[in-house]
Amino acid sequence: MPVVYVNIFLAFIVSLTGLLIYRSHLMSSLLCLEGMMLSLFVMLTVTVLNNHFTLANMAPIILLVFAACEAALGLSLLVMVSNTYGTDYVQNLNLLQC
């Protein structure tokens, strides 16, 4: 396995670990999700370019579009929670809370 793949995989693992550890604030969770999506995008792009997958050339762009939509929805949720509760705690997103 080349060093590039190992580095990208480690970036994904670090982002996943950050998501599991720092899950109290919504902003830190969103940043970790963006790190995961970025590492997946780079891994997919490197794989497509190295293996000359001509049919999968659009896959990294589609993943990037989904990442942008996820970021926009996450930021709108962050603004809504911040305006409603005054903080960005993830526990405020619990729908069973009254």
From Swiss-Prot:
GO BP term (any one): ATP synthesis coupled electron transport
Known role: Core subunit of the mitochondrial membrane respiratory chain NADH dehydrogenase (Complex I) which catalyzes electron transfer from NADH through the respiratory chain, using ubiquinone as an electron acceptor. Part of the enzyme membrane arm which is embedded in the lipid bilayer and involved in proton translocation.
Q: Which GO terms describe its cellular component?
A: mitochondrial inner membrane; respiratory chain complex I
Where does the sequence pass through the membrane? 1-21, 29-49, 61-81
GO molecular function list: NADH dehydrogenase (ubiquinone) activity
| One protein family per Pfam | Oxidored_q2
Q: Which gene encodes it?
A: MT-ND4L
Subcellular location, in the record's words? Mitochondrion inner membrane
Q: Which InterPro entries match?
A: NADH_UbQ_OxRdtase_chain4L/K, NUOK/Mnh_C1-like
Its main localization is mitochondrion
What keywords were assigned to this record?
Electron transport, Membrane, Mitochondrion, Mitochondrion inner membrane, NAD, Respiratory chain, Translocase, Transmembrane, Transmembrane helix, Transport, Ubiquinone
Organism per entry: Helarctos malayanus (Malayan sun bear)
Enzyme kind, highest EC tier:
translocase
Protein's name in the database:
NADH-ubiquinone oxidoreductase chain 4L
